[in-house]
């Protein structure tokens, strides 16, 4: 089965209008799209960092407070600067965005702008048609975060495919046990959190991240955040929306859908853990 389309959605800094993007998120999910939701009042740097780490196909930005031309153009510019020009940008908003504004944003590299009155079906169709095709062969990653994000995607995609008869796909965990991951740290802390929805898991993790970063100014932290999903359906991966301290260049966070596996973990979790073994702490 083909892997779901992954996109990131967000609301720009100094903008708290999130009702529209929440409605759109739910429609995307209903049509099999995995949505990493970053929340509102997010800076260009936060959005680009998250998009790279999540290895999404595109970023959808909902803007209602003005400044959209400069903001979306800066997102495109920073993606290119970081070597992630394959991540595309689209957006929309209310009456603050004119057709003239949309023309300017397209010239600056934005794929599409949706106006008030655009149907949800039209937005879903656009995402499926524009970002649902297989990725082209990607050039060598220009940063360690991009390289890591690509490898995590490869692991997740491989877990979604059925192995050929009488074959067993190699596990990154097996390689770690055999000493094939020379960058792994024997003292890496791996901490798991579980509990019902609303128990405060994300808040606790975010507070621990703050303390780990403050205790050791050189430490690096990784987070594998899980949300339930059914095979063939989308998922709302929204833990980033409530995290404050984890918006840091020393924190690598990946949002994972369970993709039909029971128990709260993704089929790719164990192999992804092995790939992150060079971090000081993994949560």
Kindly give the residue locations of the regions a language model identified.
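Non-catalytic signal-transmission and effector/linker regions of two-component phosphorelay proteins
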Residues: 1-5
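ATP-binding Walker
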Residues: 15, 196-199
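Extreme N-terminal, non-catalytic leader segments
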Residues: 121-177, 182-190
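The Walker A (P-loop) glycine that initiates the GxxxxGKT/S ATP-binding motif of P-loop NTPases
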Residues: 11, 195, 255
């Amino acid at each position: 089965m083909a892997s779901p389309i992954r996109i990131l959605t967000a609301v720009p800094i100094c903008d708290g209008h999130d009702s529209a993007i929440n409605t759109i998120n739910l429609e995307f999910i209903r049509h099999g799209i995995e949505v990493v939701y970053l929340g509102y009042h997010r800076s260009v740097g936060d959005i680009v960092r998250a998009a790279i780490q999540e290895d999404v196909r595109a970023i959808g930005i909902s803007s209602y407070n003005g400044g959209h031309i400069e903001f979306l153009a800066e997102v495109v510019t920073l993606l290119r600067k970081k070597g992630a020009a394959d991540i595309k940008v689209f957006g929309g908003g209310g009456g603050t965005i004119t057709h003239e504004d949309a023309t300017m944003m397209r010239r600056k590299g934005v794929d599409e702008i949706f106006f008030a009155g655009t149907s949800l079906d039209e937005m879903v169709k656009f995402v499926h048609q524009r970002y649902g095709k297989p990725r082209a062969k990607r050039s060598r990653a220009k940063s360690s975060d991009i390289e890591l994000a690509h490898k995590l995607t490869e692991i997740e995609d491989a877990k979604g495919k059925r192995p050929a008869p009488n074959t067993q796909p190699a596990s990154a965990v097996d390689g770690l046990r055999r000493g094939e991951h020379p960058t792994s740290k024997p003292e890496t802390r791996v901490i798991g959190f579980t509990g019902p929805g609303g128990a405060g898991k994300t808040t606790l993790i975010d507070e621990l991240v703050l303390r780990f970063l403050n205790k050791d100014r050189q430490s690096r932290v990784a987070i594998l955040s899980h949300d339930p999903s059914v095979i063939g359906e989308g998922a709302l991966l929204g833990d980033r929306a409530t995290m404050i301290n984890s918006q840091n260049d020393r924190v690598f966070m990946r949002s994972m859908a369970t993709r039909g596996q029971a128990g709260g973990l993704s089929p790719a979790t164990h192999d992804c853990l092995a790939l992150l073994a060079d971090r000081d702490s993994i949560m």
